[in-house]
């Protein structure tokens, strides 16, 4: 068998392998190579329908398994060979078999962006509601890696636009992370709930949007009832997330719709402005200041926005804060007396 494995696996010499088999070479369907892989899997990988047919005709198991539980049909889905997938199914391969991660051939096809294969498997009756480990369905993979047309196809076939995994993370959250307004709009129109929170940390879809999305998506979520002041288990609000990611567009929309400028996260007591200064986020700081954020708010260690910017070495941010009225006192000391950054220290010491 090793000679056949070498021809198929290593040299891709399918014609010679077929010639050997037709000449009476003794096949051992249960034989596995050093990768614990049967010859049938290598035939699928090489996309040779003729060799697959020959091997199945010689007794190879269409539902053979790799060490991770994957089947030949999953391999066909991964390698996007519809003719082989069709042949395997005609020979009673299990359509919804799953590997040790709970993946089916359908999930595999979507995950590898083979959406023609995905449609083929759905038309053959693949279960679009099957769940992998942690509760992911094929719709999650289509939302993450596909187009609106792929997502629409699955929803039209019965996939739940409000689908969520075991931690209550929804497909809508993944669509928001992609920053795709049309996909977000479509899912909402088809029933996605903008108010769902994850069970693990009480995160909401607007919090995702505040980090990754544009103003159009943020506005769309707010229009459909998303809470601009949702607080997760870390005390983070959407505006705090916008501050940590320097997302000015999202922050502008959140503030216009009533986001709390002085909300504080739980661990360090940061407000959006404190967090932005701590992380040196230059774009969002002017917006927060212009909208009235407290320039002299203090975190749990008593540091102000200016103190945080000084500690992190953000000279331009320090200049901006001072020019807009940030206090120079830290308790009984002047911030210039405690700052370590030389450029900032010089700038502060030269102030009138």
Model feature map: region roles:
Residues 7-12, 42-48, 75-81, 108-114, ...:
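Ankyrin repeat A-helix N-terminal signature
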Residues 13-21, 48-56, 81-89, 114-122, ...:
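Ankyrin repeat structural motif
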Residues 31-33, 66, 99, 132, ...:
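Ankyrin repeat boundary/linker residues
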């Amino acid at each position: 068998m090793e000679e056949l494995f070498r021809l198929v696996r290593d040299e891709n010499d399918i014609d010679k392998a077929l010639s050997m088999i037709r000449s009476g070479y003794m096949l051992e369907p249960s034989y596995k190579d050093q990768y614990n892989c049967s010859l049938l899997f290598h035939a699928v990988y090489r996309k040779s329908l003729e060799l697959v047919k020959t091997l199945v005709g010689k007794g190879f198991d269409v539902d053979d398994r790799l060490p991770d539980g994957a089947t030949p049909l999953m391999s066909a889905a991964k390698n996007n060979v519809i003719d082989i997938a069709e042949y395997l199914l005609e020979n009673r391969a299990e359509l919804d078999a799953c590997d040790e991660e709970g993946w089916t051939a359908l999930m595999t096809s979507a995950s590898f962006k083979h959406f023609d294969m995905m449609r083929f498997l759905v038309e053959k009756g693949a279960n679009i509601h099957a769940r992998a480990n942690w509760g992911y369905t094929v719709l999650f993979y289509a939302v993450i890696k596909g187009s609106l047309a792929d997502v629409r196809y699955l929803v039209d076939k019965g996939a739940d636009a409000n689908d969520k995994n075991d931690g209550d993370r929804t497909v809508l959250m993944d669509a928001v992370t992609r920053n795709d307004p049309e996909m977000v709009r479509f899912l909402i129109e088809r029933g996605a709930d903008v108010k769902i929170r994850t069970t693990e940390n009480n995160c909401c879809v607007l919090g995702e949007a505040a980090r990754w999305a544009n103003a159009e998506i943020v506005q769309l979520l707010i229009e459909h009832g998303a809470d601009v002041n949702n607080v997760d288990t870390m005390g983070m609000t959407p505006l705090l997330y916008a501050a940590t990611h320097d997302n000015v567009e999202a922050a502008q929309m959140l503030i216009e719709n009533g986001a709390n400028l002085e909300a504080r996260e739980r661990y360090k007591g940061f407000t959006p402005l404190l967090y932005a200064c701590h992380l040196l986020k230059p774009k969002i700081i002017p917006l927060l200041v212009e909208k009235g954020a407290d320039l002299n708010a203090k975190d749990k260690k008593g540091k102000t926005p200016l103190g945080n910017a000084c500690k992190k070495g953000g000279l331009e941010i320090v200049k901006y804060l001072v020019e807009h009225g940030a206090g120079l006192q830290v308790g009984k000391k002047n911030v210039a007396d405690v700052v370590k950054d030389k450029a900032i220290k010089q700038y502060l010491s030269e102030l009138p």
